[in-house]
Amino acid sequence: MKVILLQTDICWADPAANVAYMDKLISAHAQGTDLFVLPEMFSTGFCTSPEGIAESSDSATLRWMKQKAAERNCAIAGSVSVEENGKFYNRF
């Protein structure tokens, strides 16, 4: 099993920029990789006020993770700040 751990600088509270950068990294290392492990809260960075950064459980970030994993025939793991029923979670 080939596992790649990705660690990067995060563009604070900018999911589009962070996902685009992760997309480039995954594409560059996709050959033969079975699992990519992304940094914790890779799409936004940490924040003491999750109200401003939390995503829905069907966010563009999570859809991207599923799509990229299907395209590359691999697994992608990483956590995202998610809001559900008025509560906030660091969901892995």
Predicted features and spans:
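Cys-nucleophile CN-hydrolase/nitrilase-fold catalytic domain and related Cys-dependent amidase chemistry
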Residues: 15, 24-91
